[in-house]
Amino acid sequence: DGYTPRL
């Protein structure tokens, strides 16, 4: 979605 932070 372009926002959901992923490490």
UniProtKB/Swiss-Prot annotation:
Family of this protein: Belongs to the pyrokinin family.
Function: Myoactive.
Positions where Leucine amide occurs in the chain: L7
Chief location category: secreted
GO biological process: neuropeptide signaling pathway
GO cellular component, one term: extracellular region
Entry protein name: Pyrokinin-1
Keyword flag Cell cycle: no
Keywords assigned: Amidation, Neuropeptide, Secreted
Signal peptide: none
Cellular location(s): Secreted
